[in-house]
Structure formats: structure tokens, C-alpha cells
Amino acid sequence: MAELQGYXRLKKDRFRQQNFLYPLLLQEYIYSLAHYHSFNSLIFYEPVEILGYDNKSSLVLVKRLITRMYQQKSLISSVNDSNQKENGFWGHKNSFSSHFSSQMVSEGFAVILEIPFSSRLVSSLEEKRIPKSQNLRSIHSIFPFLEDKLSHLNYVSDLLIPHPIHLEILVQILQCWIKDVPSLHFLRLLFHEYHNLNSILTSKKSIYVFSKRKKRLFWFLHNSYVYECEYLFLFIRKQSSYLRSISSGVFLERTHFYGKIEYLIVVCCNFFQSILWFLKDTFIHYVRYQGKAILASKGTFILMKKWKFHLVNFWESYFHFWFQPYRIHIKKLPNYSFSFLGYFSSVLKNPLVVRNQMLENSFLINTLTKKLDTIAPVISLIGSLSKAQFCTVLGHPISKPIWTDLSDSDILDRFCRIYRNLCRYHSGSSKKQVLYRIKYILRLSCARTLARKHKSTVRTFMRRLGSGFLEEFFLEEEQSLSLIFLQXIPFLLHGLHRERIWYLDIIRINDLVDHS
């Protein structure tokens, strides 16, 4: 595999110098690299056949696909073919073959599109001589950041980044980075095959299903789109931080406020500094994960409304579509809880009374402290487990029929790994009762799955193997967490269930958390 990657690097450098990416679609090693990446990133509890991958890559199918792609005339004419629905985009009457071919192309095309971005990142790092670790941010850094900063802020804007209405917007974004016109036209052909993708992108449930089939390509396009959205925010934030306080800024802001909606571009050109002066805030923070972001500030409510107004207008002028301002909610932190990264977070006020003794006089001083409180959402977690067929909507455990063909050790391993990931990710919750309920659901669902496989009842099955049969598997995670916590602070044994532990060895968020 290392030799294949080295050969691919030489070929990519040659095509990159010529600014041609489309010929890489006709190279066999591209599809081998795409298959290697996709197979190693599968979700542990997900059947391989759902994603359409096998544990072996078929070189024969790749050769046939490349042969059909050489016939560009038939490929382009298939767009206007009246029998396209019958024969499929790739000339297959078999829907499975057509789906498999399009899936191979989309995964390979995603690898090709990442070449200009990866080479540009490496070259910029080499020029600036900055280590890569300082330019990357893990999702685990978000939790300590919110815990340290959010309790000192006043307002938060909870916003959802809308998906582009038309897919041509995604192509136009890539035009700024990729100069290969045939590759962009081929991307349009892929979009034409999924003519109903517009409804898929606007549906959260459909994104979850669709991302498992074309995950790498469309997450790459989505990240490129989000990057452009964040670029405008960072531009305004950076420019406003350089400005000084101008006394005449109040007059300019009041005069041209009502004309900004109709003459936004003119106002930005003529009075850009006066606009940015009113957006100046040294205590503003921005956090994003996927399509959800948080904009927190220590300023006033009017300042947050101005940020919302200008961000929406700049985004609409740049992307040329309505950005749905109702998706941005401005709330005051002590009175508002928001959902982010699988937690319900809020800022709690804790009143404290301190006795101050001075000589013969004593005083009682009332103080108020703020603390970030994070709670695992039990309703959304049960809903996610219900969609995965581990329990009912009300939280009653049920068996997993699709896993009855596996061995007993595989069934136990899958249930324990799901519980371990959920337990570790939500270990920062201030209320541990949610984790105990998740453990109960998965433990009983595992017992019912094993009993169904052996054609027995749960009571008979557990009586035959003993009541401690499942405990040794599910107690392993709790014991590991207890040992880690006791090594750090051994004198807080009585408060173990109240403490929050940010478990920072998670490679990726579990899909049950990610799409809840």
C-alpha cells in the first residue's frame, strides 16, 4: 500500500503541474486508494453491505468502468437520453451495477478534488514553517474552551448554516480553486445523475442516509461551502479588530442604517469602516461543528443583532440566495440552554455566601458565580437508539434481528463498543443517570438479541449463563473511568458521580450522537 501511495504521489504531482485533474479519473490506482480509505473508515457496527463495499476491491469492475468512461460521447449523450431512467447514468440496466459504478466514481473523484487543497495546505505550511499540529483543531478542544470562556460571556447566537438551494453554487465555489474545466463539467454530470439531490440536501434525515453512500465527495463539497461562509465572518472580524474608536461612527451608523438593506454594496464601499466599528468586539468567540455554529459575545443585545444583520446580508450578497435569518437565535446566556455537539449546555448561577471576619466585626458577603452545565439529552439519545432498532420510541429495549447471524462474541463486542463510545463521549455530562439508562437499554437489548439467536427467552438464557454474564462486559468502561479519575483526584470518592470527565481519546463522534 505504501508503494501504491508513493506512485500516486508522483502521478498527482505531474498532473498538478499541468492543472489537469480529469485524466486521473482514468487511472486504476485512484479507485484503489479510494476503496482503501473508505473501507478503513467504516462505522464499527454498520454492515458492510449497506455502504456497498466489500472487503476486496474488484479490479475487473474498475477496468470496465474506465473503458466506459473513455467513451465520452456516450457518456455526455446520456444526459439528454430519454431512456436514462431505464438504463441509468452509466449505461446499466441493473440498478445495483449502476449504483456501484457511480459510487466508485464519486469516491475516486473525491480523492482527485482533494489534491489541489492538500498540496496548497502543505506548501503554505512549508513556506510559513508552522507545524501542522498548530493549524488543526480537534473537536475535543471545544469542550474545555466552552467551559473556560462561555461562563464569562453574556449573549450567544445559535445559528444553523443553511444548505445551498442550487448545486451550481457548489461548482462555482470550486471554480475559485480548481482551474480544470473538464473536472467541473464532470461534477455537473454527477449532480445531474442525482437530480433529486436538492431535496436530499435540505433534509437532515436524508443527509444521514445519503452521506453513507457518497460520504467523502459530498462532505468535501459541504466543507468547501462552509469554508466560504466562515471566510466572510473571519474577514469582518479581522477588519473590525484593526479599527480605532471613532466618535463620528454613531452618526454614520444612524444615518445609513435603513439604507443598508437596499444599498448594501454601496454602503460597504463608502462606509465600510463605520460599519465595522460597530461590530468591534474583543470578546467575541466563534465555534462550529458541521452545519451548526455558536457566536458568543460579552457585548450587548444590539451588538449581536448587528452581527446577525451584517452576516446574513454579506452571505446573501456573496452566494446569491436567501440565508434564512430565522435560523439565527440570539439568547441571553444565563436564561438560555442550547444544543451543541450532543449536549444541552447552559450557564448556571451559583449563589455563595462568604463570611468575612475583621477584628471583632464579621460580614456576610453574597457572591454569584457562573458555571457551564452540560447535560446529555436523554430524549434524543433514546430516539437515536430507536432509529437504530435497539429500543422502542419510549425506551423499551428490543432485540436486534439483523445481528442474529453473527457469533456471540461479535454481538457482545458490537454492543459493548457502542456503549463504550456513548459513555466516553457523554462522560462530561453533569447528570450520570442518563448514562445508566443507556446502559440498561443496550444491556437488555444485547440479552434479547442473544436469546433470540438461541431461540430462547431472556430469563431462561440468563439463568443458564448466570446473571453476571453481561456485567463483566459493561462494567469494563465504568472501571476504566473510575481508575482514571481516582488517579487524578483520589480524595473525592464521594463525589465521583457528580464530576465531569472529558474523555479525549475519541477518534470520531459516534453516528448515534452525530445525527441525533
Curated annotation (Swiss-Prot):
<dbReference type="GO" id="GO:0008033">
    <property type="term" value="P:tRNA processing"/>
</dbReference>
<dbReference type="Pfam" id="PF01348">
    <property type="entry name" value="Intron_maturas2"/>
</dbReference>
<keyword id="KW-0694">RNA-binding</keyword>
<comment type="function">
    <text>Usually encoded in the trnK tRNA gene intron. Probably assists in splicing its own and other chloroplast group II introns.</text>
</comment>
<keyword id="KW-0819">tRNA processing</keyword>
<keyword id="KW-0934">Plastid</keyword>
<dbReference type="InterPro" id="IPR002866">
    <property type="entry name" value="Maturase_MatK"/>
</dbReference>
<dbReference type="GO" id="GO:0008380">
    <property type="term" value="P:RNA splicing"/>
</dbReference>
<dbReference type="GO" id="GO:0009507">
    <property type="term" value="C:chloroplast"/>
</dbReference>
<dbReference type="GO" id="GO:0006397">
    <property type="term" value="P:mRNA processing"/>
</dbReference>
<keyword id="KW-0150">Chloroplast</keyword>
<dbReference type="GO" id="GO:0003723">
    <property type="term" value="F:RNA binding"/>
</dbReference>
<keyword id="KW-0507">mRNA processing</keyword>
<comment type="similarity">
    <text>Belongs to the intron maturase 2 family. MatK subfamily.</text>
</comment>
<dbReference type="InterPro" id="IPR024942">
    <property type="entry name" value="Maturase_MatK_N"/>
</dbReference>
<dbReference type="InterPro" id="IPR024937">
    <property type="entry name" value="Domain_X"/>
</dbReference>
<protein>
    <recommendedName>
        <fullName>Maturase K</fullName>
    </recommendedName>
</protein>
<dbReference type="Pfam" id="PF01824">
    <property type="entry name" value="MatK_N"/>
</dbReference>
